[in-house]
Amino acid sequence: MDKTWAEVTCEIPAAMIDLLADFLVELSGNGVSIDNLELDTFSLDTMDEAPVKTVRAYFTPDDELEEKLAALNRFIQEHAPAYGDAAPAPPTVTTLREEDWATGWRQHFAPTRIGRKLVIKPTWEPFSPEPGDLVIELDPGMAFGTGTHPTTRLCLEALEKLGTAGDVLDVGTGSGILAMAAVKLGAQRVVGTDIDPDAVAVARENCAMNGVTAELVTTPLADIPGQFSVVLANILAEDLVRMAADLTAKVAPGGFLILSGILVERESYVIDGFVSTGLTLAETTREGEWSCLLYQAGQ
Ligand SMILES: C[S@@+](CC[C@H](N)C(=O)[O-])C[C@H]1O[C@@H](n2cnc3c(N)ncnc32)[C@H](O)[C@@H]1O
């Protein structure tokens, strides 16, 4: 008999996307898709204006599906009112055949423009770049970092604004998305490190697919030699604070440190954790519940 999937569709307030997506990934063990991340319709401005978003998750129909759907409905009913939806609709379920799932899942991903020049494009999508566009090909679903998460987007925007004429260090490289963007934006030398060897393997494949050269390693941060004009770290707030001295030591005089992965409510915790480093907080950018801090080292 053909294998089938249960496609579960949730209509939720836009500001609740991250919360629900995390819950769904945990519950289903699969990735999720979010509508309206298309190139033409998505921008940070329109995201705030769009009141409702569609999030889809994919479950294998098994004995636990009913239970999981009930847990999902409870989660939505409990949390959506805090985001302004007093009467959230329960999720709907459609059964998909394996072959429809394989193509149906893909249809929810489209090329996404981030900042002015960067475009993240799924490998299967045709795309005609504008002059000056820097296109990164990336398939969702392997390592963290497909450009759809606000913490990644905030880093990419910061990186594009800074320009990357010198050397760049990407701490917690995941899919390698930030490392690849740094190369495309003109960095001379890019080093990406991750504690997860699988992520490094994926990042290497992605770099090869995009024809970019970066040094991708599992070397612990403290053991990476040299200093860099830009250091990026999109990891958890607690890790950023724990690694504050090592991250700072890697920033060249006058260079920049971009910190992401910080919930807005944890922003002051991270800022406090970097006070003793001597770096200057140059800019704070936010998207939804996520915050990104840009620090600069003295000359
Ligand atoms: C949120 S993902 C970021 C991926 C990508 N850089 C992006 O911006 O989308 C965080 C990554 O950091 C890695 N990581 C966590 N702690 C780390 C550490 N102490 N040193 C290096 N990598 C770390 C994780 O394995 C994961 O791949």
UniProtKB/Swiss-Prot annotation:
Enzyme type, top EC level: transferase
Keyword Transferase in annotation: yes
User: Which EC numbers does the record give?
Assistant: 2.1.1.-
Please tell me where this protein is predominantly located. cytoplasm
Write out the residues that bind S-adenosyl-L-methionine: T152, G172, D194, N234
Q: Which UniProt keywords apply?
A: Cytoplasm, Methyltransferase, S-adenosyl-L-methionine, Transferase
UniProt cross-references to Gene3D superfamilies, sorted A to Z: Vaccinia Virus protein VP39
Q: Specify the superkingdom.
A: Bacteria
A biological-process GO annotation: methylation
* Gene Ontology, cellular component aspect: cytoplasm
- Cell location: Cytoplasm
Give the reactions, separated by semicolons, that this protein catalyses. L-lysyl-[protein] + 3 S-adenosyl-L-methionine = N(6),N(6),N(6)-trimethyl-L-lysyl-[protein] + 3 S-adenosyl-L-homocysteine + 3 H(+)
Q: Which Pfam families match?
A: PrmA
- What GO molecular function annotations does the UniProt record carry, in alphabetical order? protein-lysine N-methyltransferase activity
**HAMAP family from the entry?**
Methyltr_PrmA (MF_00735)
Q: Report the family membership.
A: Belongs to the methyltransferase superfamily. PrmA family.
Q: What does this protein do?
A: Methylates ribosomal protein L11.
Q: Tell me which PANTHER family the record gives.
A: ELECTRON TRANSFER FLAVOPROTEIN BETA SUBUNIT LYSINE METHYLTRANSFERASE
Which protein are we looking at?
Answer: Ribosomal protein L11 methyltransferase
Provenance organism: Geobacter metallireducens (strain ATCC 53774 / DSM 7210 / GS-15)
